Amino acid sequence: MAIKDLFNNFFLMDDEEEVESPEERQRRVVQNEENETNNVQQNQPQQSERSYSNQSKLKTVPQKKTTRNYNSEERNVRMNQPPSKSNGKNVVTMNQTSQSYSGYESSKMCLFEPRVFSDTQDIADELKNRRATLVNLQRIDKISAKRIIDFLSGTVYAIGGDIQRVGTDIFLCTPDNVEVAGSITDHIEQMESQHYE
């Protein structure tokens, strides 16, 4: 209830208040104006001293560099420029790559004679680099030779190449940029029959 009474009394006028006459009002206004002018004249020297001290303080404050406007202008320039052609094409299909490499990488062939299965990784790396490889497996046991051929068959299949037997335990592995023409299967069969006799 106290809050309600406070608000009710706030807007009410007491009957005992005197109503100012217009003459009294003018006298009071004139007095206020005179007091203000006197105060202003007395305070002017103090204000000038204050403003001088404020100015000296402002001189000691370092100025802030405006890097934000420069960055936003630079960003606007970059956004308004059309994209360059070099940035626009990041994806290259495998067919385009094979056409561009077919001229000079097909002339190199690597010869390998692995002694252990871990040497097969080097052969696979050469195939991935689009180089033909000739693998001689005559000096390795038959089980390891079979594992190596299985691994190389998977590698050649993954790169779209070919693997061919060209002799007794000798294989030619080629990537997709190398074409092998001709066949020597008859010659291989004759060599195998002589080898086992």
Swiss-Prot record:
Main location: cytoplasm
Feature: compositional bias, Basic and acidic residues: 22-31
Keyword Cell cycle (UniProt): yes
InterPro entries according to UniProt: Cell_div_SepF (IPR023052), Cell_div_SepF/SepF-rel (IPR007561), SepF-like_sf (IPR038594)
Chain residue ranges for the region called Disordered: 15-91
Keywords: Cell cycle, Cell division, Cytoplasm, Septation
Record field: compositional bias (Low complexity): 37-47
UniProt biased composition (Polar residues): 48-58, 78-91
Any GO BP: division septum assembly
Keyword check for Membrane: no
Pfam families membership: SepF
GO cellular component terms given for this protein: cytoplasm
Record family assignment: Belongs to the SepF family.
PANTHER family: CELL DIVISION PROTEIN SEPF
Function: Cell division protein that is part of the divisome complex and is recruited early to the Z-ring. Probably stimulates Z-ring formation, perhaps through the cross-linking of FtsZ protofilaments. Its function overlaps with FtsA.
Official protein name in the record: Cell division protein SepF
Organism: Staphylococcus haemolyticus (strain JCSC1435)
Lineage, opening ranks: Bacteria, Bacillati, Bacillota, Bacilli, Bacillales
Gene: sepF
